[in-house]
Regions:
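Acidic-and-aromatic substrate-binding clefts and catalytic sites of carbohydrate-active enzymes
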Residues: 60-69, 87-97, 120-129, 156, ...
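H/E-rich (His + Asp/Glu) clusters that bind or coordinate divalent metals
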Residues: 218, 224-232, 237-367
C-alpha cells in the first residue's frame, strides 16, 4: 500500500512539473531578465543638462551623407543636447577631406574629424616619417586629432611576424608630430582584462565571450604587457596630449587609473562603452570624477540615442538600481553619482574645448 502511495505521489509531481511552461522548467542564463520590484524615486534624463561634446564617436559614412541624412543626425544630436560629435573614423587623404567638406557644408561646426594611420607599409624604414607627413597634410585638410585603433599593439605585425608594439620607436615621429601640431591622440589599446582570463563561471565577461568568441585573447602577449606598452608610449612623449580610450580599461580599478593620471599630466581619458563600470560604484566614482575633473571627457563610442540617457542619469542624478542597456557589458544595475555642476561642465564640454582644437566655443555656455 505504501509503495503504491509513493508511486502515486511521484506520478502527480511529474505531471505537475510537466504542466509548467517550458521557460519555467529550464532557462538560459542570458534569458533571465527579472523585473525589479524595488520602489524608489526615478529621474530619467533624456537630454544632458549642458551641451556636450561626444569625444568618442564613429561616423564612417558621413562623407557620403546627403543633406537630409546629416539633418536627421543633427536633429538626434539636438534632442540629446549634443553640441559637437567627434568622428574618430575620419580616415586620411581624400576620404578625410570629403568628410570634412560634407559636414561643413551641411552642418558647420557640429562635427570634428580625427585622422587615422594606415599601417600597411609599416615595414618601410621611413614609415614613421612618412606617416607623420601625411598626418600634417590631414591636419591642413581639417583633421583636429588622431585616432589609433586597437589593431596597433595586438594585430599589426612586421613581415617577420613580430608584433608592432604601441611604443615601438619606429612610430615615434607620428606622436612627436601630433604634439608639434597641437592635436590630441585618442588611442584605443587592448580590451577588457577578462578577455585574457579563463572563460569560466568566475569571468565577468563570460556572456560577451559567449556572444563573440573571437574576442577571447591568447595568454601572450598578456593584458598587462599590451597596456604597459600603451602607458609607456604616453610617458615617452610628454609634449603630446593622449586620450586613453575606454578609461584605459581601468574603470574597475579607478585607484590605479588615478595613479597613472597623477604620473602623466599629458594623459586624459574618456568613457566610451565603460559607463557600466562607473554605475556600479557611485561613491568611489564620484570621488574620482571630482578629483580628476580636468582629465575626463564624455565619450560614448556607438551612436544609439537612447543609450546616452543612461550616461546622463549616472552623471546627473542620485537614482538607485536602474537598468543598463547591454547585458554583455553589465549584468548589474546602475546608480547615479549626482555630480556637481562644475564637474558636469568639465566632463561635458570644458575639457574637450581645452584639448581639441577648432571646436566652436560659442555652442557652449560662457560660464
Amino acid at each position: 500500500m505504501r509503495r503504491c502511495l509513493y508511486a502515486l505521489v511521484g506520478i502527480l509531481l511529474t505531471a505537475s512539473y510537466a504542466s509548467l511552461p517550458s521557460y519555467a522548467q529550464e532557462m538560459q542564463w542570458e534569458d533571465y531578465a527579472p523585473r525589479s520590484t524595488l520602489v524608489v524615486e526615478e529621474n530619467p534624463v533624456t537630454s544632458a543638462k549642458y551641451p556636450f561634446v561626444d569625444a568618442h564617436a564613429h561616423q564612417r559614412r558621413i562623407g557620403e551623407m546627403s543633406e537630409a541624412q546629416v539633418d536627421e543626425l543633427v536633429a538626434e544630436m539636438d534632442a540629446l543636447n549634443m553640441a559637437v560629435m567627434v568622428n574618430l573614423s575620419g580616415g586620411s587623404g581624400e576620404d578625410l577631406l570629403q568628410k570634412v567638406e560634407n559636414t561643413e557644408r551641411y552642418a558647420p561646426g557640429r562635427f570634428v574629424h580625427y585622422a587615422n594611420i594606415d599601417f600597411d607599409t609599416v615595414d618601410d624604414p621611413d614609415f614613421g616619417e612618412k606617416a607623420a607627413a601625411q598626418l600634417e597634410r590631414d591636419v591642413a585638410n581639417g583633421a583636429k586629432g588622431l585616432k589609433i585603433f586597437k589593431s596597433l599593439g595586438m594585430e599589426i605585425t612586421y613581415e617577420d611576424g613580430t608584433r608592432v608594439k604601441t611604443d615601438d620607436p619606429h612610430l615615434a615621429p607620428i606622436w612627436e608630430k601630433a604634439g608639434e601640431l597641437g592635436i590630441p591622440v585618442l588611442i584605443h589599446t587592448g580590451d577588457p582584462a577578462p578577455f585574457w582570463q579563463p572563460q569560466d563561471r568566475y569571468n565577468e565577461r563570460w556572456f560577451e565571450l559567449k556572444q563573440y568568441p573571437n574576442r577571447k585573447r591568447p595568454p601572450e602577449p598578456s593584458w598587462e604587457t599590451i597596456m604597459g606598452d600603451h602607458w609607456n608610449l604616453i610617458r615617452q612623449h610628454p609634449n603630446t596630449t593622449f586620450i586613453s580610450a575606454h578609461l584605459s580599461w581601468l574603470g574597475n580599478d579607478l585607484g590605479r587609473l588615478g595613479e597613472l593620471l597623477d604620473e602623466m599630466p599629458n594623459m586624459y581619458t574618456e568613457l566610451g562603452a565603460v559607463i557600466g563600470e562607473i554605475g556600479r560604484q557611485p561613491r568611489t566614482a564620484r570621488e574620482f570624477f571630482i578629483e580628476y575633473q580636468d582629465r575626463i571627457l564624455m565619450g560614448k563610442d556607438s551612436f544609439a540615442p537612447e543609450e546616452y540617457h543612461v550616461y546622463f542619469r549616472i552623471f546627473e542624478t542620485d537614482d538607485e538600481y536602474f537598468p543598463y542597456y547591454r547585458l554583455r557589458h553589465a549584468f548589474w544595475s546602475m546608480y547615479g553619482m549626482d555630480l556637481p555642476d562644475e564637474v558636469l561642465r568639465k566632463v561635458y564640454y570644458k575639457n574637450a574645448l581645452a584639448i581639441i582644437p577648432g571646436i566652436d566655443a560659442s555652442l557652449f555656455p560662457d560660464e
